[in-house]
């Protein structure tokens, strides 16, 4: 398990854009399973949407990319580099994420090429049901 303090040593993100609370499973360079606890106190709920709060899909993708960043950030070729989101393919949103949900995010390294570019297969679930999935592309930059 990786707690929030350790996550902040791996990722450059901070509140309000650090969207991973904890990592339950971690296989360096292979896969990670992280958690995002969604509360009504999230700043994005003020405007998305008043009276019917929903987690924006773009932020769900960002949370999946951050779990992917934890995986690729631990690759040997990533030492001293920052993993940046450079593309998203095959994205599907299946269900809404609302306050009180605990999102379980899985990211698996599909392939890392040229030691600077890679693709992660990601998925998010709430209560065992798929809410979103995407292929996340990243680049390692100095």
Swiss-Prot record:
It is an enzyme of class 4 (lyase). Its EC number is 4.2.1.59. InterPro entries: FabA_FabZ, FabZ, HotDog_dom_sf. CDD domains: FabZ (cd01288). The keyword Lipid metabolism applies. One of its GO terms (biological process) is fatty acid biosynthetic process. It catalyses: a (3R)-hydroxyacyl-[ACP] = a (2E)-enoyl-[ACP] + H2O. The keyword Lipid biosynthesis applies. SUPFAM superfamilies: Thioesterase/thiol ester dehydrase-isomerase. Keywords: Cytoplasm, Lipid A biosynthesis, Lipid biosynthesis, Lipid metabolism, Lyase. Involved in unsaturated fatty acids biosynthesis. Catalyzes the dehydration of short chain beta-hydroxyacyl-ACPs and long chain saturated and unsaturated beta-hydroxyacyl-ACPs. PANTHER family: 3-HYDROXYACYL-[ACYL-CARRIER-PROTEIN] DEHYDRATASE. This is 3-hydroxyacyl-[acyl-carrier-protein] dehydratase FabZ. It comes from Gloeobacter violaceus (strain ATCC 29082 / PCC 7421). The gene is fabZ.
């Amino acid at each position: 398990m990786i707690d929030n303090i350790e996550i902040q040593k791996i990722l450059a993100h901070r509140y309000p854009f650090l969207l991973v609370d904890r990592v339950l499973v971690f296989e360096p360079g292979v896969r990670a399973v992280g958690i995002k606890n969604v509360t009504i106190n999230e700043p994005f709920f003020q405007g998305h949407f008043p009276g019917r709060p929903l987690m924006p899909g773009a932020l769900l993708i960002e949370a999946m990319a951050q779990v992917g960043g934890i995986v690729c950030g631990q690759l040997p070729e990533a030492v001293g580099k920052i993993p940046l989101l450079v593309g998203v393919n095959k994205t599907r949103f299946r269900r809404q994420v609302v306050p009180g949900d605990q999102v379980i995010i899985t990211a698996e390294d599909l392939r890392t090429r040229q030691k600077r570019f890679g693709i992660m297969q990601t998925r998010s679930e709430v209560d065992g049901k798929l809410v979103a999935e995407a292929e996340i592309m990243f680049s390692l930059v100095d």
